Amino acid sequence: MRTHYCADVNEQHIGETVTVAGWVASRRDHGGVIFIDLRDKDEVFQLVCDPADNADAHKIAEEVRDQFVLIATGKVRARGEGLENPNLKTGKVEMVVDSLTIENRSKPMPFELNDEKVNEEIKLKYRYLELRTQKAYDTFKLRSKATIATRNALDELGFLEVETPILTKSTPEGARDYLVPSRVHGGEFYALPQSPQLFKQLLMVGGFDRYFQIAKCFRDEDLRADRQPEFTQIDVEMSFCDQEDVITVAEKLISDVFIKCGFDVPTKFNRMTHSEAMEKYGSDKPDMRYDLAMVDVIDIFERCDNEIFSGIAKMPKKNRIKALRVPKGDEIFSKRQMKGFEDYVRKFGAQGLGYFQMKEDGLKGPLTKFFTEDDIQAIIDRCGLEVGDAVFFGAGEKKLVWDYMGRFRIYLAETMDIIPEDTFEFLWVMDFPMFEVEDGKVKALHHPFTQPKSLDFNDIEEIESIAYDVVLNGTELGGGSIRIHKEDVQEEVFKLLGISEEEAQSKFGFLLDALKFGAPPHGGFALGLDRMIMIMTGASSIRDVIAFPKTQKAQCLLTQAPSEVDNEQLKELSIRVRQAAPTA
């Protein structure tokens, strides 16, 4: 049907007859000569329909409109002097059309394909049209390249690609499961996997040693810009390994994929403990493209003549007082901006935001009256203040302070426009707490199959796990852990999580049984493929890197899913639908 893709036609083909096919990107009539920009998968090629050359082709070209599907045959010639287009691979040549066929016509487009301001709901409803754009094609070409590079890298490292079940048992791992009713077993349900976690551990028990999968995962959770109800992860597991072995494989894989996709990245990543990340940056996924690190000043504030601050400082295990130095901040920010910063952190639960300004004649600000000269000097020294700097203080319960000061750090960086573009800063965050306590309930910070460093403890929140996350530019790219491979340890962890023996057997009995049959030490990691491509392309939403994504309400506007099903289907599944209560 065609002899060449548009992008392949160049000066070497001048004088040759070629056939190309694609969609009309634009049509222009210049004094009876019709110019058509024909676009196929990744390039535009100019067609010239001149009645002096071929009257039949010109007559057909008069009918052509945007997005018509054409097949064109003709001779390649050089463009006239001054008419070349350096932005196109085909910009030095054009086709004089001898034969033109309209393979299909198109209705007028519901939106301008390259208009970035078009309502997103319209674009998602007609997603197949948006996929015709060069931007979309380049995105999925990069995604394909990353996927191929992943398989090649892991194959070279001796990993075996194995597919695990999509219909499985409901074992909630933090988010809600998507449930699938069984027709054969009425009243019973499968669940779509939130991850292949348990199956990949069972593969290690089965002796597969090194496994990987580019896996579809499903989580019924509230959506954000970097979340979708169904997503893809690069899933990896290996036996007879320690944390260093896993990290070595992960760094090799990640760097190989980025380099194969044309990016310059390091092959070894920096590391930081979870505790250091929270204390310095207020986040377990800090963006290391810029500095703005916090320091602890709770001991200095304990001596201040302010009952609120000194009271907070008297409980250093529970509370924090953090200082965040902004170089030249006193010169950059107005008093109005300073007040605006306080309003910003209040949105996240802060009672306020203190600040000092480093002037030529010393430290100034509304809080200086509460400190002795020695303590003011201690603040200057601790924070490394220089003339022109500003320093901001957050005080209160530690998790609250970490949260709002961490958000404030990002807000400052965005306000000052100091975040470099086209830079990739990877970071391993290590030594995560095994558990966290919320409302008196113990939860696993990662998942309950993570190996704890020890189960000897006075405070359950002090137990550390052998877990690690890889962070890229402030986004959690993925993470993993060494797994529990002994039944008694797994049972003890379930017990600490408040999971009874009966519940453990009901939900995880198959895993506990497998651990009785010589399970090897094992560990692994998973990387979010969608997030990786989102960062590579600079996309603002994960929806831009998924071919047919869902909305913020987990709907597919293209197919109108989810949708009602007929009563006969429900009857076969032994399901009766109860009308949902109206939402406020």
UniProtKB/Swiss-Prot annotation:
The keyword Ligase applies. InterPro entries: Aa-tRNA-synt_II, aa-tRNA-synth_II, aa-tRNA-synth_II/BPL/LPL, Asp-tRNA-ligase_1, Asp-tRNA-ligase_1_N, Asp/Asn-tRNA-synth_IIb, AspRS_core, GAD-like_sf. It is an enzyme of class 6 (ligase). Gene3D superfamilies: Bira Bifunctional Protein, Domain 2, GAD-like domain, Nucleic acid-binding proteins. Its main location: cytoplasm. Signal peptide: none annotated. GO terms for cellular component: cytoplasm. One of its GO terms (molecular function) is nucleic acid binding. Residues 197-200 are annotated as: Aspartate. Its EC number is 6.1.1.23. GO terms for biological process: aspartyl-tRNA aminoacylation. This is Aspartate--tRNA(Asp/Asn) ligase. It comes from Sulfurovum sp. (strain NBC37-1). The gene is aspS.
